[in-house]
Each structure stands twice: as C-alpha cells, then as structure tokens.
C-alpha cells in the first residue's frame, strides 16, 4: 500500500495538481475499492482465472491499455496555456472511478492474489475478511501520504513549465510501473 504503483503515483499527481481536499474522493475510492476487491476475489472470483485462463490475459490487456490512457491524461493535463499560472485543467478522479480502477490495476491484482494465497489459501470467509480489514486499515494512511507528498510539491510547481514537467514525469513513471506486467 505504501510502495510506488499506479494508485500512489496518480494520487501524488492529483495531490500536486488539485490538493489534498479535492483528491479525498480519489483516496477513499482507492482504499474502499481495493478492500472490496480483496473480499470479492477472496470469496471466489479468483476461480474465474482458474476456469478461464484467457480471462487473465484479457485483464492484463485491458489494464495496460487503461493505464496508458491514464498516463496520457496525466501527461497532457497541463496548466492553462499562456496564463503564466500553474493551475491544472481537468478534475481529480472521482470516488467511483477510483473504486472501478482497482479492477484494472495490475499492482492491485498482484497484491490481492498474493495476500489471499498466503493468508487465506482456503478461501475461508473469516480469513478473507481479516486480510481485507488489515489492508483496509493500512491503505488509507498510506495513500494519504502520497497525496500529501503531492500537495507539498505544489510550492515547487509554480510555473506552467514546472507543472508540465511534473505531470510528464508522473505519467512516465506510471508507464514504467507497467514493466512487471509485461514480463512473460
């Protein structure tokens, strides 16, 4: 939950572009969405991948495509051209968008499948709920720290050029985070 990945990089970019308060729905969507995903995967959705192995490959393709789209949106969310102010265009991700994003987040899937296979291998409901509760309790403070880091960077992003450079850097890091997904 604290390590760099698509959620945290997007939250840092959102914190830098929109501030902590406007990013709050995005943070809550990540925390609650991932917890919900853990529960649903833990109680049986993982069986889909076992029954239909091609569904995992489809998920990978959709995930990569969506993350590339989000990276493009971040990279091109520049400030108002020619205004001299570093006020970003666009809006932060909504609660629902962040909840839904968890289902195409490759790092989220990796974390969920690993945690559930190690700590709830028998798909026992109590074990699944315990794993989800632990992640739920840890997740929000972790994602908040990335948003706060982004907000702290606002004082450095005072010109159009700096904001554009920051957004392009965050988008590039988001694309680089796909490297493990693309490995055979």
PLM segments and residue spans:
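Hydrophobic alpha-helical transmembrane segments in multi-pass integral membrane proteins
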Residues: 40-42, 103-113, 172-184
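Residue-level signature of transmembrane alpha-helical cores of multipass secondary-active transporters
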Residues: 30, 98-102, 135-139
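Hydrophobic/aromatic residues within the transmembrane alpha-helices of Major Facilitator Superfamily
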Residues: 2, 36, 72, 103-106, ...
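Alpha-helical membrane-protein architecture signal
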Residues: 88, 92-100, 126-130
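Flexible cytoplasmic inter-helical loops of multi-pass small-molecule transporters
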Residues: 76-93
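Juxtamembrane transmembrane-helix termini in multi-pass membrane transport proteins
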Residues: 1-57, 112-135, 147
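Selective transmembrane alpha-helices of multi-pass membrane proteins
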Residues: 50-79, 139-146, 156-184
